[in-house]
Amino acid sequence: MQQYFIKGQVENPVIIKDKDTVKHMFNVMRLTEDDQVVLVFEDGIKRLARVTDRENHVFEVIEDLNDNVEMPVSVTIASGFPKGDKLDLVTQKATELGAQAIWAFPADWSVVKWDGKKLAKKEDKLAKIALGAAEQSKRNHVPEVRLFKKKGEFLSELDNFDKIFIAYEETAKAGELATLARELAKVESGQKILFIFGPEGGISPSEIDAFEEAGGLKIGLGPRIMRTETAPLYALSSVSYALELNK
């Protein structure tokens, strides 16, 4: 069944006002009277609804659905700005894998440089990708997408997390394999977790120092070296296995 995220709080009847949502519902999917869909408002509760007025885009809420697919913890993925469209892939797949937020920041060794206008345009594009992926994967929430203009702005957010993991290539090369598994075993429901990944060039020594000063732990992600767009997906899969599948 089709699922749509609706801005604002639940009301009955529901009038869809967002132009993109209206276009997709009634022009692309060609919904008509009595067709049923799932609507998700900002409270994250899924609700079964049916079309009562196609011309005016009106729905009647039928019932709340007991369907929560969110992880028991809040996971934020933060990547140094990578080249090309790699963030597009990370955003789509991280949303499918359960991330609550997808962030990116200008790392010391990031090759790309985005000014204010490009940054806003990129952020808007990624937000749309996250919305589409959240609808497809039947999420209860659309992940926050945030691109930091300055690294200092990102660093100021680190105090808001219960655990910070730094995916560090040199740690993986040294054969460190146990830290992530050990720490995930200690995680409690509702905690906020941050994973930090470098761009193609990796994380600089000064960045490692700053992240560790904020309480971050260096981790390896298995014995193999991954691309910057692969590592976040491995990390999210590890969290899902530890906290959802292995319970």
Residue spans for each PLM region:
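N-terminal positively charged helical leader segments and presequences
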Residues: 1-67
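Mobile, glycine- and charge-enriched loop segments
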Residues: 37, 66-77, 184, 188-189
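Generic structural signal for residues in well-ordered beta-strands
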Residues: 59, 142-146, 218
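Short, acidic/turn-prone active-site loops that include or flank metal/cofactor-
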Residues: 65, 171-172, 223-226
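RNA substrate-binding interface of SAM-dependent RNA methyltransferases
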Residues: 68-166
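Structured adenosyl-cofactor binding patch, chiefly the S-adenosyl-L-methionine
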Residues: 204-247
